[in-house]
A protein has these predicted regions:
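Short aromatic/hydrophobic "clamp" motif used to bind/position activated sugar donors
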Residues: 82
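Donor-binding/catalytic cores of nucleotide-activated saccharide
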Residues: 90-190, 194-202, 206, 214-229
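Catalytic core of nucleotide-sugar-dependent glycosyltransferases
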Residues: 212-219, 226-254, 269-300
Length: 410
C-alpha cells in the first residue's frame, strides 16, 4: 500500500462528506495504490452508506477530539505515505498522485501541493502564500526554520491537508505527540500545527509542486469559526500551548535563537488575532488572559501585514469541476486523443503535460476536441482584486460578524 488518506469525521454534513470521498475516488490515484481511512470520532450521524459506496475503511471511536483522531489515523495507516483530507473538503483530480510520485522519486519526507478557499460563491487561491507562488526544496537543518520563518502567516505550512508525509516520519513522532494529546480532554485547535512542527523537526528533505488544488471549504459549521467566549478561550488556550510546546522542543542547532524569535513573533501574531476577535465580539475583558497566555507585554489589534498573504488572490473558474472531469477523461482514456488547448488556462495546460508525461497518448492540435472554456465571473475578479480585497481586510475588522459573513459568502 503506497498511500493512506486519513479522513477524520465528526458529524459533518453528509453531503459534504460524500463530496469529499467522491473527489478522492475520481482522481488520478490508482485504486490499488491507496486506502481511504475514515476515523469516525463518535459521530451521531450514520455514514455507513457513504463509506460503503466509496470503499473506505472505517474505525469508530468514542468522541475524544480531532487530535486523538488524527493520531489514531497515523497509528492505523497502512500506506508508505500519509495525507489528510478534512471530511468537509475536496481535492482536484490530480492532487495526491503527483505528490506521491514526487515524494518517491526524490525521497521526500514532506511534499506540498497548492490549495484554494472554497466559499459559497467561488473558489480562489492565495498567491501571497509562498508555497503556491514559488518552488522550493529544503534539506537538513534548513527544514524546521522553513516551517517557522513565516511566523504563522502562511496557511500552507501549519495545516496538515496541503501535504503528503512519509509514514515513517509521522509514526516516529507519535511518542512525542501522544502525551500532549492525552494531557487534555479535548485538544481541538492548532493540533495540526503541532503535528507539522514535530514532522518538520524529524524531516531531512521537503519540497513542493503545483499540479492541483486542495479545496478548503468555508462554512458556518466549522470548528475554527469563533462564535462564543468559551470557544475563543479554548482557541487561545490551545494555540498558546502549541507555541509553548514548540519552544520547549526546538533542537539545539546553530539557528536555534533564530527559530525562537520566529515562534515568539508567531505568538505576537496570534495575540493580535485573538485580541481582535475578542474586541469585535465584546470580550475585551479577556485582555489579561490573552496577554498572559502569549507572554506578550501589550496587546494590539491585527495589522494589515498580519493578513498580507491573503491579499493577493487568483479566482478559479466557476466550472473547475467540469474542467477536472474533462481532464480526468483524458487520464482514463485508453485511445489516442487529439485535444485543442486554444482556450485552456495554465492549470489545464499543466495538467495535460502531466498526463502526457505519464505515457498517455495525447496530441495537441487546433482541430482536436476542445476542453471546457474556463469561465470566471467579472464580479469575482473585481471582489478579489488586490486593492478591493485589501480594503476589505482594512475596513472589516478581524473577528467581526460581518467579516465572517463575507468570508463565507464571497
Amino acid at each position: 500500500m503506497k498511500l493512506s488518506l486519513i479522513v477524520c469525521l465528526y458529524n459533518t454534513p453528509k453531503s459534504y462528506f460524500s463530496e469529499c470521498l467522491h473527489s478522492i475516488k475520481n482522481s488520478t490515484l490508482k485504486t490499488e495504490d491507496y486506502e481511504i481511512l475514515v476515523i469516525d470520532d463518535g459521530s451521531t450521524e450514520n455514514y455507513s452508506d457513504v463509506i460503503n459506496e466509496y470503499g473506505a475503511r472505517v474505525i469508530k471511536t468514542e468522541n475524544r477530539g480531532i487530535f486523538r483522531a488524527r493520531l489514531l489515523g497515523i497509528e492505523e495507516a497502512q500506506g508508505d505515505y500519509i495525507s489528510f483530507v478534512d471530511s468537509d473538503d475536496t481535492v482536484s483530480f490530480n492532487y495526491h498522485f503527483p505528490m506521491l510520485l514526487h515524494a518517491e522519486e526524490n525521497d521526500l519526507d514532506v511534499c506540498f501541493n497548492d490549495w484554494a478557499f472554497h466559499t459559497e460563491r467561488t473558489r480562489y487561491s492565495c498567491f501571497g502564500d509562498s508555497s503556491i507562488s514559488k518552488d522550493f526544496i529544503y534539506e537538513g537543518d534548513a527544514v524546521l526554520p522553513a516551517f517557522l520563518k513565516n511566523e504563522g502567516r502562511e496557511h500552507s505550512y501549519f495545516v496538515l491537508w496541503t501535504k503528503l508525509f512519509k509514514a515513517s516520519v509521522l509514526k516516529g513522532i507519535l511518542a512525542d505527540l501522544k502525551p500532549i494529546a492525552e494531557s487534555e480532554e479535548r485538544y481541538n485547535y492548532s493540533e495540526d500545527t503541532l503535528i507539522c512542527f514535530f514532522a518538520f523537526k524529524s524531516s531531512k528533505k521537503i519540497a513542493n509542486l503545483h499540479t492541483g488544488y486542495y479545496f478548503y471549504r468555508i462554512h458556518s459549521n466549522q470548528t475554527v469559526n469563533i462564535i462564543s467566549e468559551e470557544r475563543l478561550l479554548s482557541h487561545i488556550k490551545f494555540m498558546s500551548k502549541t507555541l509553548d510546546v514548540m519552544l520547549e522542543n526546538l533542537p539545539e542547532t546553530d539557528n536555534q535563537s533564530e527559530m525562537e524569535a520566529s515562534i515568539k513573533k508567531w505568538a505576537g501574531l496570534m495575540s493580535r488575532t485573538h485580541y481582535s476577535h475578542a474586541k469585535a465580539n465584546k470580550y475585551s475583558h479577556l485582555y489579561d488572559f490573552i496577554k498572559d497566555s502569549y507572554h506578550v507585554d501589550t496587546l494590539k489589534k491585527s495589522t494589515f501585514h498580519d493578513n498580507s498573504s491573503y491579499s493577493k488572490n487568483k479566482v478559479l473558474p466557476v466550472n473547475i469541476l467540469e474542467i477536472d472531469t474533462a481532464l480526468l477523461d483524458l487520464w482514463n482514456s485508453e485511445t489516442e486523443d487529439h485535444v485543442c488547448l486554444c482556450e485552456a488556462n495554465k492549470y489545464m495546460r499543466r495538467s495535460v503535460r502531466f498526463i502526457k508525461k505519464q505515457g498517455k497518448k495525447i496530441k495537441v492540435s487546433p482541430e482536436g476536441r476542445k476542453l471546457p472554456t474556463p469561465r470566471v465571473k467579472l464580479i469575482d475578479r473585481i471582489i478579489m482584486n488586490k486593492v478591493v480585497y485589501s480594503l476589505g481586510l482594512i475596513f472589516f475588522k478581524k473577528g467581526s460578524r460581518i467579516r465572517a459573513f463575507l468570508k463565507k459568502h464571497i
